């Protein structure tokens, strides 16, 4: 199955469900580290809203691509805590928080809402009562009424594309990115161009719909997987998909996966540079950039001395976010073998140390008028 349409991607793009060993809920520690690095930006965004003369009675906030797990709860707690702090400082009365949790229809909303406790949202008698609603659907379309959101947050979601890039087969129907699932050193220039073009189209669409939904001067905090280097085929940018492609190729060589399935599969994700992100925002013209920065974190927990333990932990993280979309192409029955092979490749690469993972923090304000 080629991920050539939005409909197909929307069906299979979600994190591993439940609370089992391979679930996203149990393997989201890396994205938790990323979110903690961006927490000051979120706190500052909430504080900024109180200085923009909104005359707030209720703050409407949305977490787009929320998945299911502790990271979502931390976002709610941070917003609520900052609102309570500002209310005490400004002596606000009857201020409420409405949080909308959004993701695609395949997301595990049951696990998400089962995890919501009074510790996260508090009770309705507190100084800032919190109300939480689920909003299933694609954030590449309209989700909310016009001028209704004060704050938009999204972590590690916007780098996912609506579909595999267009134009990755020749006129004769031959795969142009043969043996790979993402941009690599062996990919022809057309592959890089197609990925950037698809990201430009999708991110522009994302900004356009958010500009319709957000109030003037509303704040948006985005965290996305990105890259520091200029070259998108640099291993620092693409190593996860490169190693996964090697694991798939190993199973192809063993006759366990059809080679054509590998050649026709391209992951619908793009790790943009800061310059590319900034350029798209400026071209769109709906938002001002209040802050943009990139930072690197270790891809594997370096505190653990045993390289096999480190490799297995990294595999669980990758499996949690990649298995649904990978299994849709190569079959559920082969997944244990595939990720076992991936672990072996990761462990061998640990000898040379895996590259760090780059994330981008982007803080935007909607332009008035």
UniProtKB/Swiss-Prot annotation:
Binds 1 Mg(2+) ion per subunit. It is an enzyme of class 2 (transferase). Keywords: Alkaloid metabolism, Magnesium, Metal-binding, Methyltransferase, S-adenosyl-L-methionine, Transferase. Its EC number is 2.1.1.160. Caffeine binds at residues 31, 156, 159-160, 225, 321. SUPFAM superfamilies: S-adenosyl-L-methionine-dependent methyltransferases (SSF53335). GO terms for biological process: alkaloid metabolic process; methylation. Pathway: Alkaloid biosynthesis. S-adenosyl-L-homocysteine binds at residues 24, 66, 71, 103-104, 138-139. Its cofactor is Mg(2+). The record marks 153, 225, 269, 317, 332 as: Involved in substrate discrimination. Pfam families: Methyltransf_7. Mg(2+) binds at residues 177, 263, 265-266. The keyword Transferase applies. GO terms for molecular function: caffeine synthase activity; metal ion binding. It comes from the Eukaryota. InterPro entries: MeTrfase_7, MeTrfase_capping, SAM-dependent_MTases_sf. It catalyses: 1,7-dimethylxanthine + S-adenosyl-L-methionine = caffeine + S-adenosyl-L-homocysteine + H(+); theobromine + S-adenosyl-L-methionine = caffeine + S-adenosyl-L-homocysteine + H(+); 7-methylxanthine + S-adenosyl-L-methionine = theobromine + S-adenosyl-L-homocysteine + H(+). Caffeine is catabolized to produce theacrine in Camellia sinensis var. assamica cv. Kucha, but not in cv. Puer. Belongs to the methyltransferase superfamily. Type-7 methyltransferase family. Involved in the biosynthesis of caffeine in cv. Puer. Involved in the biosynthesis of theacrine in cv. Kucha, a caffeine-like xanthine alkaloid with diverse beneficial biological activities including anti-depressive, sedative, and hypnotic activities, improving learning and memory, increasing exercise activity, and preventing nonalcoholic fatty liver disease. Catalyzes the conversion of 7-methylxanthine (7mX) to theobromine and of theobromine to caffeine. Has 3-N- and 1-N-methylation activity. PANTHER family: S-ADENOSYL-L-METHIONINE:CARBOXYL METHYLTRANSFERASE FAMILY PROTEIN. This is 3,7-dimethylxanthine N-methyltransferase TCS1. It comes from Camellia sinensis var. assamica (Assam tea).
């Amino acid at each position: 199955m080629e991920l050539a349409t939005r409909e197909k991607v929307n069906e299979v793009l979600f994190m591993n469900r439940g609370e089992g060993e391979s679930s996203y809920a149990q393997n989201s520690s890396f994205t938790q580290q990323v979110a903690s690095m961006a927490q000051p930006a979120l706190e500052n965004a909430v504080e900024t809203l109180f200085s923009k003369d909104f005359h707030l009675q209720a703050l409407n906030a949305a977490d787009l691509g929320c998945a299911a797990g502790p990271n979502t709860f931390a976002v709610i707690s941070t917003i609520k805590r900052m609102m309570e702090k500002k209310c005490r400082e400004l002596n606000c009365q009857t201020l409420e928080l409405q949080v909308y949790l959004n993701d695609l229809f395949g997301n595990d909303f049951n696990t998400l809402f089962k995890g919501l406790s009074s510790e996260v949202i508090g009770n309705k008698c507190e100084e800032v009562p919190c109300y939480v609603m689920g909003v299933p659907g694609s954030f590449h379309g309209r989700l909310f009424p016009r001028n209704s959101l004060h704050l938009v947050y999204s972590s590690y979601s916007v780098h996912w594309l609506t579909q595999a890039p267009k134009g990755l087969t020749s006129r004769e129907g031959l795969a142009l990115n043969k043996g790979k699932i993402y941009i690599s050193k062996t990919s022809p220039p057309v592959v890089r161009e197609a990925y950037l073009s698809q990201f430009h189209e999708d991110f522009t669409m994302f900004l356009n719909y958010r500009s319709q939904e957000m109030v003037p001067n509303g704040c948006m905090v985005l965290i996305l997987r990105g890259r520091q280097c200029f070259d998108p085929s640099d291993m620092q940018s693409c190593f996860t998909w490169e190693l996964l492609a090697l694991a798939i190729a190993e199973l192809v060589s063993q006759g366990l996966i059809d080679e054509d399935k590998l050649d026709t599969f391209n992951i619908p994700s793009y790790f943009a540079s800061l310059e590319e992100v900034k350029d798209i925002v400026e071209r769109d013209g709906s938002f001002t950039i209040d802050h943009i920065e990139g930072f690197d974190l270790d891809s594997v927990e370096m505190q653990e001395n045993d390289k096999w333990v480190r490799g297995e932990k990294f595999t669980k993280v990758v499996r949690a976010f990649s298995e649904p979309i990978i299994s849709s192409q190569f079959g559920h029955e082969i997944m244990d073998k595939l990720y076992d092979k991936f672990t072996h490749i990761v462990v061998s690469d640990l000898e040379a140390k895996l590259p760090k993972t780059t994330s981008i923090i982007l803080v935007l304000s909607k332009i008035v008028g």
